[in-house]
Amino acid sequence: MYGIEYTTILIFLISIILLNYILKSVTRIMDYIIYRFLLITVALFALTRAQNYGLNLPITGSMDTVYTNSTQEEVFLTSTLCLYYPTEASTQINDGDWKDSLSQMFLTKGWPTGSVYFKEYSSIVDFSVDPQLYCDYNLVLMKYDQSLELDMSELADLILNEWLCNPMDITLYYYQQSGESNKWISMGSSCTVKVCPLNTQTLGIGCQTTNVDSFEMVAENEKLAIVDVVDGINHKINLTTTTCTIRNCKKLGPRENVAVIQVGGSNVLDITADPTTNPQTERMMRVNWKKWWQVFYTIVDYINQIVQVMSKRSRSLNSAAFYYRV
């Protein structure tokens, strides 16, 4: 009987010793794996960081300056330039290699091949619905058209400024504008915006809140509309929600990495949204040529002077980001 008990105790002790040995072995193996993994991770991180030195160098002075990466032999420029032009330009030029030709010309001004991107848009109206300004510097060419003068002004006001925007639920709430920097911006394939100003008893001023036909129309069948109403007064808003969206926006200030080149027209458009703001013409320029080749030649010739009145910014613009924070 005692022999069986001693045997059981002995087996139990041996099991504990064996388990302790196994645990120590596993611990040593895990420590080795973890330390090796950390060593490899640190080494890769150091190499990766070294390859990126110089990518975020600030630009000081002329765009002719190029920077060399300290761990790579390639010469590169830290900035990109996007040139937005209407379909009319490529149609008139009618040359399959015209972009390559212009790239070679930009090269003589200090812009390496691959740093200049050409973006085509069908019309000012369509471009205003989905502006995409992703480069460090963005030049938008707009052919002057008297019938589209207001559309051009609104588009320029949109892309030359930064906006902080929030969605509006016009089915549940009334809205008012707090100041001249506060605007309602609607976008879509067809935007018709009507408003009914309200008094302190929420009764319509010159309109009936239950009758949309009595509302005041401030935009009709537009793709982009920047709506300005009397500040400090609640408004009930009616909108074609199936084809349009509307956002409550505040103008924060100039978007300094964008410039607009107006092609033609007697004067540069004044994009000022209200009479108390000084006209913004520094980044709104005009060239007056009939042929698009001449327009592009002029831009290449003066590209570095144009960039000097701009500032490189990291914030991009598209129709989705614009709604919330640009």
From Swiss-Prot:
Alphabetized InterPro entries for the sequence: VP7, VP7_1, VP7_2
List of glycosylated residues: 69, 238
PTM note: Intramolecular disulfide bonds. N-glycosylated.
UniProt region (CNP motif), positions on chain: 165-167
Gene3D superfamilies documented for this protein: Glycoprotein VP7, domain 1 (3.40.50.11130), Rotavirus outer-layer protein VP7, domain 2 (2.60.120.800)
Family: Belongs to the rotavirus VP7 family.
Subunit-level organization: Homotrimer; disulfide-linked. 2 Ca(2+) ions bound at each subunit interface in the trimer hold the trimer together. Interacts with the intermediate capsid protein VP6. Interacts with the outer capsid protein VP5*.
Identification of the protein by name: Outer capsid glycoprotein VP7
Organism ancestry: Viruses, Riboviria, Orthornavirae, Duplornaviricota, Resentoviricetes
